[in-house]
């Protein structure tokens, strides 16, 4: 960010950082269908400022001076086409103003910008407005959807000087000392110079409706001033929504609160509102979204749950839910934590640990109820947040069974299935829950490792999330049935009858095939640990599997890729003894050993390709293929 300072050293002109500049261009030239969200964002910022002041005033009451009641005021000036949002919250110093309004710390900004471009392109084709801004909530900058000039005047609580920030949204902003006549005694004033097509936001009835619908739940009173100098009218009483009985709260109120606290524009898939009494007394209002935020996998993001103590905001960085539930949004209000607890000491509090345990259990149980009651709605939750659920299988041993019950998997049977459904459909003599892990769902579906299982109607879990290869090693079983990779060790398929009973009568493996397998084992001894006849293959000639002990094929690839293993172990080459290709190669005898060695190594490369790998030596693979094709052509013309 570059800056220019006036000769008196007070006024300063700066250039927005690159991401902000792009974002502002999108706001200025916005085609968003719901521009009302700018007001929700400004009110949300104002409410946060009031709550932060209330927290700081616990240790420094002098910050409140003679203005202890928090308030947000919206003032209309229709004649000048201006809209002003005032709060008497914590305010900003000059440096805080530059940092808060000139940069974006949010890790998902780039992703938001890219997604918004996609949405704009789609909406242009369809002739509709897009609503991605409501989903991601870019806060203050949304003001430029309705204003061609924005001025922010702020005075930090306890400070003497006030500062003015101004920008037309075209790439630069200025920071200057504010005149005392226009500065609030404490807090922040945001003045919007509305564009011609946004002058409707000076209509009192329209503003009242927007505020009541979108922000009537904020825990700070909101007043409306119809024109400068007029008496204020209260349009929201500041009663925190979570303190009201559930029976007194309508669905629309819950949705509006969710949109404010989550920064999403959709409706929640699940709302969890309860009051706990007993050893710990607290109220929780939590939401499970339908869509995923871009920053869910960022390690430095703020916590998704706001912590209050007796309606005083404490922090949004408390560890109130385990990481595998980081997609949940909402508030928790404790009656037991001391108001003067420091943010540093919160994490050490046994009260907080008890609250975390309670709300974690409640969220999991409510998700289980949703899954039972509305499989379609729960399916959307799983599609959005399934990878995070799976993290909990190896992170939270005490909740493993509950999390496994919530998991849904794509299988060789088709649609999403629960493990309970899977176990209920086990075949006679089936003792394991079989799975195939990999990076590509389509490749998994076509894997030769599945052939023997399909022939017997045995369902296999198809696991294509990166986390899958890890949690299966941490979850020894489900309802007494162990998890077993179809790419590792023996299959135990011999005891399970085939669907086609006529296929059970298979010809004995010939002596020549047995000898050929021994030849393969000798020829490939430096590349594979063993060569053996396969039960799992019915249509393909070969496949690679891992030894019974150690990681399966996919996990081994991941560990080698991240440097946890120095190299891959030798795989086992399984051969389908009844495949026509194997029978033909076995019938060659010892007449052309060089050709047989070429075919042996070609079979191994074939297995590697089917396993998602490349031949170990591309040049030699090409030469070997040419020799085999030449031999085949020579034989066909003989």
UniProtKB/Swiss-Prot annotation:
<dbReference type="Pfam" id="PF13589">
    <property type="entry name" value="HATPase_c_3"/>
</dbReference>
<dbReference type="InterPro" id="IPR020568">
    <property type="entry name" value="Ribosomal_Su5_D2-typ_SF"/>
</dbReference>
<protein>
    <recommendedName>
        <fullName>Chaperone protein HtpG</fullName>
    </recommendedName>
</protein>
<dbReference type="GO" id="GO:0005737">
    <property type="term" value="C:cytoplasm"/>
</dbReference>
<feature type="region of interest" description="B">
    <location>
        <begin position="344"/>
        <end position="557"/>
    </location>
</feature>
<keyword id="KW-0067">ATP-binding</keyword>
<dbReference type="GO" id="GO:0140662">
    <property type="term" value="F:ATP-dependent protein folding chaperone"/>
</dbReference>
<dbReference type="GO" id="GO:0005524">
    <property type="term" value="F:ATP binding"/>
</dbReference>
<keyword id="KW-0143">Chaperone</keyword>
<dbReference type="InterPro" id="IPR001404">
    <property type="entry name" value="Hsp90_fam"/>
</dbReference>
<comment type="function">
    <text>Molecular chaperone. Has ATPase activity.</text>
</comment>
<feature type="region of interest" description="A; substrate-binding">
    <location>
        <begin position="1"/>
        <end position="343"/>
    </location>
</feature>
<dbReference type="GO" id="GO:0016887">
    <property type="term" value="F:ATP hydrolysis activity"/>
</dbReference>
<dbReference type="Pfam" id="PF00183">
    <property type="entry name" value="HSP90"/>
</dbReference>
<dbReference type="InterPro" id="IPR020575">
    <property type="entry name" value="Hsp90_N"/>
</dbReference>
<dbReference type="InterPro" id="IPR037196">
    <property type="entry name" value="HSP90_C"/>
</dbReference>
<keyword id="KW-0963">Cytoplasm</keyword>
<dbReference type="GO" id="GO:0051082">
    <property type="term" value="F:unfolded protein binding"/>
</dbReference>
<feature type="region of interest" description="C">
    <location>
        <begin position="558"/>
        <end position="638"/>
    </location>
</feature>
<dbReference type="InterPro" id="IPR019805">
    <property type="entry name" value="Heat_shock_protein_90_CS"/>
</dbReference>
<dbReference type="InterPro" id="IPR036890">
    <property type="entry name" value="HATPase_C_sf"/>
</dbReference>
<keyword id="KW-0547">Nucleotide-binding</keyword>
<keyword id="KW-0346">Stress response</keyword>
<comment type="subunit">
    <text>Homodimer.</text>
</comment>
<comment type="similarity">
    <text>Belongs to the heat shock protein 90 family.</text>
</comment>
């Amino acid at each position: 960010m570059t800056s220019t300072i006036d000769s008196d050293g007070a006024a300063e002109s700066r250039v927005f950082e690159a991401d902000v500049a792009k974002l502002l261009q999108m706001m200025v030239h916005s085609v968003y269908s719901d521009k009302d969200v700018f007001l929700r964002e400004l009110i949300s910022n104002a409410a946060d400022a009031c709550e932060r002041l209330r927290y700081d005033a616990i240790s420094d009451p002098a910050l409140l001076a003679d203005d202890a009641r928090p308030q947000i005021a919206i003032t209309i000036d229709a004649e000048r086409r201006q809209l002003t949002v005032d709060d008497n919250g914590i305010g900003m110093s000059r440096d805080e103003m530059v940092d808060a309004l000139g940069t974006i710390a949010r890790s998902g900004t780039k992703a938001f910008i890219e997604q918004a471009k996609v949405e704009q392109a789609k909406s242009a084709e369809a002739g509709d407005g897009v609503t991605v801004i409501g989903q991601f909530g870019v806060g203050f900058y949304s003001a430029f959807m309705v204003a061609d000039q924005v001025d922010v005047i702020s005075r930090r609580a306890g400070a003497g000087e006030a500062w003015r920030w101004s920008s037309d949204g075209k790439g630069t902003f200025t920071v200057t000392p504010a005149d005392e006549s226009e500065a609030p005694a404490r807090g922040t004033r945001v003045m919007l110079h509305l564009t011609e097509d946004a002058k409707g936001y000076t209509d009192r009835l329209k503003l009242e409706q927007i505020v009541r619908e979108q922000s009537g739940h904020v825990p700070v009173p909101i007043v409306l001033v119809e024109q400068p100098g007029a008496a204020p009218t209260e349009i929201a009483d500041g009663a925190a929504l979570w303190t009201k009985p559930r029976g007194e709260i309508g669905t629309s109120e819950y949705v509006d609160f969710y949109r404010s606290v989550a920064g999403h524009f959709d409706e929640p898939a699940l709302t969890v509102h309860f009051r706990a009494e007993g050893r710990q007394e607290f109220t929780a209002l939590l939401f499970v979204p339908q869509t995923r935020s871009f920053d869910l996998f960022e390690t430095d993001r703020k916590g998704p749950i706001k912590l209050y103590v007796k309606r005083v905001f404490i922090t949004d960085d408390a560890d109130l839910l385990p990481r595998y539930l980081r997609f949940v949004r909402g508030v928790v209000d404790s009656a037991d934590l001391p108001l003067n607890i420091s943010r540093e000491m919160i994490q050490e509090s046994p009260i907080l640990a008890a609250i975390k345990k309670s709300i974690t259990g409640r969220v999991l149980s409510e998700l289980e109820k949703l899954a039972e009651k509305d499989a379609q709605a729960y399916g959307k939750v799983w599609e959005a947040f399934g990878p995070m659920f799976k993290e909990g299988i190896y992170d939270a041993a005490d909740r493993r069974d509950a999390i496994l019950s919530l998991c849904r998997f794509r299988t060789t049977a088709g649609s999403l299935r629960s493990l309970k459904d899977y176990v209920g459909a086990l075949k006679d003599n089936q003792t394991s829950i079989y799975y195939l892990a990999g990076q590509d769902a389509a490749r998994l579906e076509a894997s030769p490792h599945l052939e023997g299982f399909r022939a017997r109607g045995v369902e296999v879990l198809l696991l294509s999330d990166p986390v899958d290869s890890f949690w299966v090693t941490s979850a020894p079983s489900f309802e007494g049935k162990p998890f077993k990779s179809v790419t590792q060790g023996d299959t135990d398929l011999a005891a399970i009858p085939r669907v086609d009973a006529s296929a059970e009568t298979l010809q004995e493996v010939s002596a020549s095939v047995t000898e050929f397998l021994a030849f393969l084992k000798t020829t490939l001894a430096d590349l594979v640990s063993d060569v053996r006849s396969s039960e799992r293959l019915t249509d393909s000639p070969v496949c690679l599997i891992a030894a019974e002990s150690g990681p399966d094929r996919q996990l081994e690839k991941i560990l080698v890729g991240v440097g946890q293993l120095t190299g891959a172990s030798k795989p086992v080459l399984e051969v389908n003894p009844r495949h026509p290709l194997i029978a033909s190669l076995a019938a060659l005898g010892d007449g052309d050993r060089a050709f047989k060695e070429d075919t042996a190594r070609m079979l191994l490369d074939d297995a590697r390709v089917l396993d998602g790998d490349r031949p170990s030596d591309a040049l030699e693979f090409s030469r070997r293929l040419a020799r085999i094709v030449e031999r085949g052509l020579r034989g066909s013309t003989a």
